[in-house]
Regions:
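Compact nucleic-acid interaction/catalytic patches
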Residues: 28-30, 36, 41-80
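A broad, low-specificity signal marking well-ordered, structured residues that form hydrophobic/aromatic
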Residues: 6-8, 46, 87-93
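Sequence-level motif detector for i,i+2 pairs with an aromatic at +2
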Residues: 3-5, 43, 84
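C-terminal terminal-subdomain/extension
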Residues: 62-178
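GIY-YIG nuclease catalytic motif and its immediate N-terminal context
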Residues: 1-30
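Short acidic, gly/pro-rich beta-turn/loop elements at beta-sheet edges
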Residues: 18-20, 45, 58-59, 102
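Residue-level detector of flexible, active-site-proximal loop/helix-junction positions
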Residues: 14, 55, 99
Length: 178
């Protein structure tokens, strides 16, 4: 089971099943993703935030935005396990558990974000971006169509639930006949 504030590696199959030009590349299952939250209304849907080590590129974007007097809720730079990383909140996407390849580990230890202030800051930014996405607001020209992916994931969850119920019914019918 996924745990909030841990980092995970996404299976490449996700990017095959949901091809979107603007989804961040998975770097051969080496890009860590931060598990931000589980959807309250759809507990099978999890939202993850890709990370990047391209600090200068994103620091420049943040500085330009802040120079205009605006805050930057789409990106967040912080230290993760002794290394600066960028949380690409603008590129967060929904996922289901079967597409999680494994926990992201350092020296065999699963990486977890522990600093409560960092968790609150990221959560606040994630909530803002999620609310924009839910309302269908396009805020980036290179924004992946994550709501289309979410809808497809919800359809797949519904199909799996129906198939599971049919299996249960078939099993109980077989046991009744015995």
């Amino acid at each position: 089971m996924l745990q909030e504030h841990y980092f995970y590696i996404i299976d490449d199959q996700y990017f095959i099943d949901f091809p979107d030009t603007y989804l961040r590349g998975n770097h051969q299952e080496n890009r860590p993703h931060y598990f931000a939250f589980q959807e309250p209304s759809n507990p099978g849907i999890f939202w993850v935030v890709p990370l990047s080590s391209r600090i200068q590129k994103y620091r420049s974007i943040i500085q330009k935005k802040e120079a205009t007097g605006k805050s930057c809720d789409t990106l967040h730079i912080m230290d993760v396990a002794g290394k600066e990383e960028v949380f690409l909140i603008q590129d967060m996407f929904p996922i289901v558990e079967r597409y999680i390849k494994r926990e992201y580990t350092i020296s065999g230890i699963p990486l977890k974000l522990l600093n409560e202030n960092d968790i609150k800051t990221i959560r606040k930014k994630v909530n803002k971006v999620y609310n924009l996405l839910i309302r269908g607001i396009k805020f980036m020209p290179t924004q992946p169509n994550v709501m289309k992916i979410r809808d497809e994931l919800l359809k797949r969850i519904a199909v799996e639930e129906v198939l599971s119920l049919k299996e249960i019914a078939a099993t109980s019918d077989n046991q009744s006949e015995s």
